[in-house]
Amino acid sequence: LRQLEYINMLPLPLRIERPSFLNALCAPNGNRPHVIAEFKRASPSRGDILMDFPPEEAAKQYAEAGASCLSVLTEETYFKGTLGYLKRMSAPGLPLLRKDFIFDRLQVAATAATPASALLLIVRLTPDAALLRSLREQAEAHGIDAVVEIFDEADLALARDSGARIIQVNARDLDTLQVD
């Protein structure tokens, strides 16, 4: 991304009306819980997962089953994802969460060039409240909600200091990879 920035070739933000991730989770849903259905090709703990299953089909099936939003792993090394999955999974029109290790403004810019409605910011990767706030504000300027992930009370304090509106808890400690 830095090379693309250097030669002034970063992808342009998509000029689309993104469905709101936050609004989808807050919308009345009868007595049913809101479900964020996740698509990932692999994980460090489980290895490969349904490598041949088309992302488009996963999105269709999740939507038909009543998911409110889709979570899409785009990290390439550990989860075998790609940014392209976001476009491939956009047909049902559900809000898409880009799950990746995002810690830089260029990654937020790259997200803005996709149909993602939200992106994941992990406090452990951005332990500076000012940086976390800056990345969140940059995302929101593109109409993208920021989902801020925490593990403990110290992370929660940083998330609150950053102005986070959506906070998710990860039971896995990213320092030790142990589940609490």
Question: How should these model regions be labeled?
Answer:
Residues I36-E38, I122, Q168-N170:
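Non-cysteine beta-strand/loop elements that form the S-adenosyl-L-methionine
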Residues L1, E137-V147, F151-A154:
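Alpha/beta catalytic cores of nucleotide-metabolism and tRNA/nucleoside-modifying enzymes
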Residues C26-N29, K60-E64, K87-A91, A110-A113, ...:
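Acidic (Asp/Glu)-rich catalytic clusters
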